């Protein structure tokens, strides 16, 4: 009987990785939900109660909130993509890795091929983060310009 040197994928390990991927996706969705909720609350405050001086401050706070949630969402997407690579490696769907990248049983560490500033930048510029948060920031800047124009005294 021949001994196969290639390790069969462990279903339990793949299940753990898949659960982590799902959790990262849910976290990214929750980041978007909370961002929209907080921005909506700030804009309601801006329209209802804010004085002239605090209108500008409120818009800048809203832009800061968007930047914070964009960073968080990008991080979750970055991790999700790393765990997808780990899933493919564990399932044996990618070519053999170098010896330094070998995984042990039930290893949940993202391999080096799935980490780095380049991968984080790709996650930041993806449609699900870059377009979503970029559009919100553009709309807030347009609102800032509109409130500035509305407050110019007429002669």
For each predicted feature, which ranges?
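Cytosolic-side membrane-entry/anchor segment at the start of a transmembrane helix
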Residues: 1-45
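Short membrane-interface loop/juxtamembrane segments of multi-pass integral membrane proteins
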Residues: 10-20, 92-123
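Inner-leaflet juxtamembrane helices
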Residues: 27, 58-111
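Hydrophobic, aromatic-rich alpha-helical transmembrane segments
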Residues: 30, 55, 59, 126-130
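Lipid-exposed faces of alpha-helical membrane segments in multi-pass integral membrane proteins
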Residues: 38, 60-68, 135-139
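Structural signal for the C-terminal ends of transmembrane alpha-helices
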Residues: 45-51, 145-148
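Hydrophobic alpha-helical transmembrane segments
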Residues: 52-64, 154-155
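A hydrophobic membrane-anchoring alpha-helix module
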Residues: 104-155
